[in-house]
Amino acid sequence: MSRAMALSQLLPDVALARDVQVSGLVMDSRAVRPGDAFVAIAGFGAHGLGFAAQALASGASAILFEPPAPADLPVPADAIAVPGLRARLGVLADHFHGAPSQAMRMIGVTGTNGKTSTVQLLAQALTLLGTPTGTIGTLGVGLYGAAVPTGFTTPLVLQTHAELAQLRDAGAQAVAMEVSSHALDQGRVDAVQFDVAVFTNLTRDHLDYHGDMAQYGAAKAKLFARAGLRAAVVNLDDAFGRTLFAALDPALHAIGVSSRAQAGATVQAQDLQLDHHGIQFTLHIGEAAHPVRSPLLGRFNVDNLLAVAGALHALDIAPAQIAEVLGRLQPIHGRMNRLGGAHGAPLVVVDYAHTPDALEQALTSLRSHAQDRLICVFGCGGERDTGKRPQMAAIAEVTADVAIVTDDNPRGEDGDVIVADILRGFARPDAAIVQRDRAAAIHQAISMAGADDIVLIAGKGHEPYQEVAGVRHAFDDAAVAAQALLPRTGLGVRV
């Protein structure tokens, strides 16, 4: 639904030389359409005023900037100085789009691992329960099952509110949203009214940005201190989660979840069993207890299901309904996706695990399902936290029977340097197989696997590309694995 608003209505406290109609708020000059207001603020590499002329040429009706302007950049004659503009962007976007987050039940999910799975599983559950639900996150934006990729885990603040408005206008009654630490630190969810906040876990990642774990955790905690929040769902099996839970505002409906009998947990999984069919457990919510049988693989998916159960409980869904819908949830693309496993072929699992903790969880979980060897194909992304490279190697060496080191997304970094960093983490580097060609590494792993082996292809999950030297080439781990399975099964299809 197209919107338009007088600039004087959007900025009633700012003196305007002339009033104009604004049809959108945009920070990217390349995305400006006629009638949009171009918001020019300082970015990581440049100031938006440097692109004001391009925005005007594309039909921008107004240029908004935060004073003082950089001395080396020209300011268009009609540009409007808005004091504190950056801090006001969320409120302005919320006002412009008619407060979309207040029209839907908003669930924000944060944590190092499990955000995408939890958001997708929660949206799937709510949809099955009859509530049209939108998603915003790594897999894109849209109503559940129809998300369009955007390239962001959490979009920039103007786009966040625009996408919430689109979901509202498309009929969404609820939104499950990934909220990254970057988003919380950079104000990308400013003025979004969350009803429920969910914490999955905190493990090493993004220290190239946050500096240390304390700052990383503090960024995550911001989601739980927001005005208007009604409920918090926290994983009490995580050490930081327990600290976070203890510090919650007493006015919040605090819901602790645990699969390890942590004290204070409202939602628990007990009597856990894992087999080649999936997982089963008894779901306890308060005094209620119901059996759950899920086709999902891996112990960490128990944690994801508990996060979903906690969020549904916060939304006043009955325990019996929660248990029933958990058993109907299907795997998420790129998250412990299963291929093969029949007709004499090994079980192949494609997963997004790209942090030390996620890799350890994936391997440990699959070890519980494995009848024979566990073969791991993994790499590390270029131009990202280098400290996790040897950590992931050590985990693969200890937890898997065979480790094949390959390229992930080298980006602009030398792949040989990345591999050398990884190999430093092996106690016996000579025991690791190095095959930098990712497709060849996947084929090698599957060809060497026996019928009772499990092959984990870790790191890229749902990504349909491999980024090398700044160029994204079409590449899909699951598609390559399916092709490699063909000689073993004649089918190469997912099961």
UniProtKB/Swiss-Prot annotation:
Residues annotated as binding meso-2,6-diaminopimelate are R384, D408, N409, P410, R411, G459, E463
Class in the EC hierarchy, top level: ligase
Which keywords, in A-to-Z order, does the entry hold?
A: ATP-binding, Cell cycle, Cell division, Cell shape, Cell wall biogenesis/degradation, Cytoplasm, Ligase, Magnesium, Nucleotide-binding, Peptidoglycan synthesis
Query: Known NCBIfam families for this protein?
Result: murE, PRK00139.1-2, PRK00139.1-4
The residues the record assigns to binding UDP-N-acetyl-alpha-D-muramoyl-L-alanyl-D-glutamate are S29, T153, T154, S180, Q186, R188
Q: Name one GO biological process term.
A: cell division
Task: Give a short account of its post-translational modification.
Answer: Carboxylation is probably crucial for Mg(2+) binding and, consequently, for the gamma-phosphate positioning of ATP.
User: Pathway membership of this protein?
Assistant: Cell wall biogenesis; peptidoglycan biosynthesis
Names of required cofactors: Mg(2+)
What's the protein name?
Answer: UDP-N-acetylmuramoyl-L-alanyl-D-glutamate--2,6-diaminopimelate ligase
Query: What's in the GO CC field?
Result: cytoplasm
Q: Where is this motif: Meso-diaminopimelate recognition motif?
A: 408-411
Q: Where mainly found?
A: cytoplasm
UniProt-listed InterPro entries:
Mur-like_cat_sf, Mur_ligase_C, Mur_ligase_C_dom_sf, Mur_ligase_cen, Mur_ligase_N, MurE/MurF_N, UDP-N-AcMur-Glu-dNH2Pim_ligase
